[in-house]
Amino acid sequence: TLEDLEEGIRFVHQNDKKIYLTLNLFMHNRDVAKLPQFVETLRHLQPDGVLIADPGVFMYVKEHAPELNLFVSTQANICSSLAVKFWQQQGAKLCVLGREVTFEEMQEIRRQCPDILLECFMHGAMCMSYSGRCLISNYLADRSANQGKCAHCCRWHYKLHLRLKDGSVKEIEINDQNKDAFEFLLEEEFRPGELYEVVEDEHG
């Protein structure tokens, strides 16, 4: 609740620490009407920074709450010094680099962008296959899906290694003969063609 956030921010500041709030959703038109209320809440709470990924949201918050420190979320997929410089020119105080950026690239970006705070994830999910930015192809085949060279790893056949209760590992190959023994559905073979169907309800 708003009261919980107020209490949390007050506690953090009383202990000389900083607190950041996220507004890093990618907005659909149906969400835009809610943005003024979100921004008013942020202005009321006065966090030490706000993490944003959507350029439109960044522009709106910058215009309507210029006193807030704006940070760019990892979901903005910042992978180069050019992208960092762009966001810096827009008024960003900190950029969280994309999860696929190597340590060597981070060092180079730091040298080329010395006057802005940079942050990176050290551990956690890799958020693969969202909006076409598939990292599986990069990782398994050294082919960038974002540059028209996708290896379509999502369509490969895989083997599962299951760890049993006794600690032993059993290899299982999923094929037409044993697929009905599993509780999950191998959807891909039941869909003709190369493209996924678009299925959408009132929730998106």
Regions found by a protein language model. Give the residues of each.
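Active-site pocket-lining/capping segments in soluble small-molecule metabolic enzymes
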Residues: 1-78, 82, 96-100, 104-204
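As written
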Residues: 91-92
